[in-house]
């Protein structure tokens, strides 16, 4: 199976007669499972240096895997440590000593594992999380050349069993039941089965009629921005809270009544223009919490003999946590991949020693056979 190849390069100029290229050979970087149980993502690729007609002398070539957590609202605008937290986790020294590279392409392979507890790449209104491969090339009598290749790290939670949520509404006899997928994905439409039981209680002339069902998906963002180690305590941390509407709809018909219960399948989805952000949670100098909820509201009217009673209506509201993650693809993490099995391959050919010992002269020949149908004169 051919590998997935992604390239990103920096074009050369007349003052800089070389080109840097990062070729990723690993599949998309997806961490499967929650942060406390995920095994992370495996990244591998090639770093390529293409030198044009003139030889290139480099003092060193170093590449690092860097995570940058930045904010748009720092406590101190003039302090770079208050604006961003930069950490390097992996380092490759492709060239430690001064080396002359001739015309052509020079490659260095690299591979590393991104821990599963790392937050995925996130772009929120308050805090951003980015990952890059940062390559630094030192050339004599010239400023250092820095090349940054962005990495898109995702998280996916793969589960098969649906989630069931139940809610009682005392003092009425109504019971609401929701059966929905355990997670949803951005820009996807998923079915949610809604059941409302107790609309026609036994031995009672009073019942309930469903008039409207409405739903909405909300995204809750909570962020706390602290100062760096130098400015901690000089100002109070900034705390931000925001609730965004990702999708909503309402229905006034379409459900089915089956005796004492009402059944309705509701398609829910996020809007194309909402730009949802996947669930994420981490603490530290920059703390961020993003979660999603499905809010379902139904309006029921009390009736007697199919006639309303003094317009006695009730609003029944349910809130269910609805995690939003990226699609899982094959859903197999790097540590669960099994090597190919070749059960159909036959035994290996004989060794050369056995062939040399059994030469053709050692093989006995069968005795000659005499013809039996020869007539003599």
UniProtKB/Swiss-Prot annotation:
What InterPro entries does the record point to? Arrestin-like_C, Ig_E-set, LDB19_N
User: Which Gene Ontology cellular component terms are annotated?
Assistant: clathrin-coated vesicle; cytoplasm; cytosol; nucleus
Q: Which Gene3D superfamilies match?
A: 2.60.40.640
Please name the SUPFAM superfamilies in this protein's record: E set domains (SSF81296)
What Pfam families would the database entry show?
LDB19
Which stretches does the entry tag as region Disordered? 345-377
Q: What Gene Ontology terms describe what this protein does at the molecular function level?
A: protein-macromolecule adaptor activity; ubiquitin protein ligase binding
- Output the GO biological process annotations, alphabetical, semicolon-separated: clathrin-dependent endocytosis; ubiquitin-dependent endocytosis
Name-wise, this protein is Uncharacterized protein C1F12.05
